Amino acid sequence: MAEIKYKRILLKLSGEAFKGATGYGIDIPTVRNIAQEIKHICLMGVEVAIVVGGGNIWRGATAAKEGIDRVSADYAGMLATIINAITLQDALEREGIVTRTQSALSVQQVAEPYIRRRAVRHLEKGRVVIFAGGTGNPYMTTDTAAALRAIEIEASVLLMAKNKVDGVYTADPQKHPEATLFQHLTYMEAINKRLQVMDATALSLCLDNKLPIIVFDLQSSESLVSAISGQPIGTLISSES
């Protein structure tokens, strides 16, 4: 069994991770596969917290461009993340992994309110904690929510799971086949090069709190195990040059 380098992690799952090959919405077999990957590292003793996006159902920024009030559009996006969180929680519990969903919005029928100390206690007891509802504030992305929650729970690393992209490239590898993969970037390099790893607010939070980020392809075999073991995978973003 691989040795664990990161004992407590924050895994950021984009909404795109839930849609599989369907192109929209939630693909249940895909969610089950994600749950099985998470189960694997839980059984290794890793404390796992997750932030989910909602772009497979709703994109607030896109809706705002179509004329919908930005604040309303962003709140709709937060609700989309709750749908994804509930689905993932069910998949994890079917795998025998005790899971709690905490929401930044008040939806007490389906999720606990976000309380930092309670979240940490869940993690210490070996439960997976899914954070839904973003930060609870409009104009804030789920990437920012991931950075914020990771810092609050004192995670060792922020794992940014991507679909079909195995790290950060000099350009979009799907549009530019000649693009090359960065194995390591400093926070400032990621910000200054505008590589769209995550939004500037999220990157700045990681920079200020020296939270390392690993960008990797979730669909790659045992990629989560490699990431938590400190094996070379994807792109590492940290303060070290």
From Swiss-Prot:
Record comment: activity regulation: Allosterically activated by GTP. Inhibited by UTP.
Gene3D superfamilies: Acetylglutamate kinase-like
GO cellular component, one term: cytoplasm
Main location: cytoplasm
Pathway(s): Pyrimidine metabolism; CTP biosynthesis via de novo pathway; UDP from UMP (UMPK route): step 1/1
SUPFAM superfamilies assigned: Carbamate kinase-like
Keywords, alphabetical: Allosteric enzyme, ATP-binding, Cytoplasm, Kinase, Nucleotide-binding, Pyrimidine biosynthesis, Transferase
Positions annotated to bind UMP: G54, D74, T135, G136, N137, P138, Y139, M140, T141, T142
UniProt-annotated binding residues for ATP: K12, L13, S14, G15, G55, R59, N163, Y169, D172
Subunit annotation: Homohexamer.
NCBIfam families with a match to the protein in the record: pyrH_bact
Protein name: Uridylate kinase
